Amino acid sequence: MLNAIRKNGLTLAIFACATTGLVAMTQYLTKDQITLQEQKQLSSVLNQVIPESAHDNLLFESCTLVSDSALGSDKAMPAYIATRNGQATAIAIESVAPDGYNGAIKIITGIDTSGTVLGTRVLSHQETPGLGDKIDLRVTDWITSFTGKQLNDGNYNSWKVRKDGGEFDQFTGATITPRAVVKAVRNTVEFVNTHREQILNQPLNCGGHYE
């Protein structure tokens, strides 16, 4: 009886060790593949907000962290520096619209050195399907309405939805969501316009960041 218990215990121990080893080996073998997929995903998003023609560097490796309440979060946000022939051409920066209808909306905006928006994309949201989710490019092209826009003293008040006297469309039955995104993009552009040199001169300390 005692020998049988010992034998069973030894068998279980061997099985546990083998299972643990298999899990560890699987994680080791898939780690590089996961990293590669994350980099591809990040590169795809970055190239939507900063055209490939505008840079010759790897954007996901040219990242710095910035913190400011204008970016809608108390966390440091990544900013990706685009360069061509060693000269800065644009910045893609993540920010948050904290006042979406169903919570925070995470976005990324590409802005060139003249202050022109090259593109904006929604990274994550929890907005209502069929209503607020129209901010998602997979649903409508509304988010592309920021492309080509600039922010200055003369047009600051136009950076609102039409219901509030601005130039951006709201959605039928869903004004809160686009209002939150327009405000967040406006704040982001204003932040970059004000702090561009500071951002460009910071150390690159967050390459490969993606959530």
Swiss-Prot record:
Question: Does the UniProt entry include the keyword Transmembrane?
Answer: yes
Name the keywords, alphabetized. Answer: Cell inner membrane, Cell membrane, Electron transport, Flavoprotein, FMN, Membrane, Phosphoprotein, Translocase, Transmembrane, Transmembrane helix, Transport
GO CC term (a single one): plasma membrane
Residues with the FMN phosphoryl threonine modification: T175
GO biological process, any: electron transport chain
Give the subcellular location. Cell inner membrane
Q: Where are the transmembrane segments?
A: 9-29
The residues forming the signal peptide are none
Task: Tell me one Pfam family matched here.
Answer: FMN_bind
Tell me which family the UniProt entry assigns to this protein: Belongs to the RnfG family.
**Task of the protein:** Part of a membrane-bound complex that couples electron transfer with translocation of ions across the membrane.
SUBUNIT field: The complex is composed of six subunits: RnfA, RnfB, RnfC, RnfD, RnfE and RnfG.
Protein name per UniProt = Ion-translocating oxidoreductase complex subunit G
